[in-house]
């Protein structure tokens, strides 16, 4: 039996196989997964909001369980407005866990009715990060096996020097 709704927020700059792994595992557990492409004022994304949303759409196609949304404010406010009580985060290592525990405590303070769940990333993707992918691309390195195959050229094209 599946559960209700969950939100999976992130910058997804770019969308990786680690993100996809967590997303599909959430879709196996929940009836509805909102993947939230965040507007993060503390980061300067390589890809625009629309590019990031389109990347995810290209990978998942039409999927009744997964809805791609954009949040420019607090995720807890979006959760309240849409009656979402669970926020999910992927955890690669203890550094992620430390950061995410602090964030979950703050989110709980802002929205006491919510809970945060943590999914360990599959060991194949424990080292994958959007930052690492961008660093590899700066030196024209291969990103196959790090991002969905259908996105490799789209992502690489952003880094080709003109």
From Swiss-Prot:
The keyword DNA damage does not apply. It catalyses: (R)-4'-phosphopantetheine + ATP + H(+) = 3'-dephospho-CoA + diphosphate. ATP binds at residues 11-12, 19, 90-92, 100, 125-131. GO terms for cellular component: cytoplasm. GO terms for molecular function: ATP binding; pantetheine-phosphate adenylyltransferase activity. Homohexamer. Its EC number is 2.7.7.3. The record marks 19 as: Transition state stabilizer. Pathway: Cofactor biosynthesis; coenzyme A biosynthesis; CoA from (R)-pantothenate: step 4/5. This is Phosphopantetheine adenylyltransferase. It comes from Brachyspira hyodysenteriae (strain ATCC 49526 / WA1).
């Amino acid at each position: 039996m599946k559960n209700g709704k969950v939100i999976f927020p992130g910058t997804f700059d770019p969308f990786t196989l680690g993100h996809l792994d967590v997303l599909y595992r959430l879709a196996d557990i929940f009836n509805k997964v909102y993947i939230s492409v965040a507007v993060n004022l503390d980061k300067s994304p390589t890809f625009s909001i629309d590019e990031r949303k389109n990347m995810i759409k290209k990978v998942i196609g039409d999927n009744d369980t997964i809805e791609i949304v954009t949040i420019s404010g607090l995720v807890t406010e979006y959760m309240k407005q849409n009656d979402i009580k669970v926020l999910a985060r992927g955890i690669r290592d203890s550094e992620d866990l430390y950061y995410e525990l602090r964030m979950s405590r703050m989110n709980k303070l802002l929205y006491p009715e919510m809970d945060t769940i943590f999914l360990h990333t599959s060991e194949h993707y424990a080292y994958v990060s959007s930052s690492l992918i961008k660093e590899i691309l700066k030196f024209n390195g291969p990103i196959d096996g790090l991002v969905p195959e259908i996105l490799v050229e789209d992502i690489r094209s952003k880094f080709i020097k003109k």
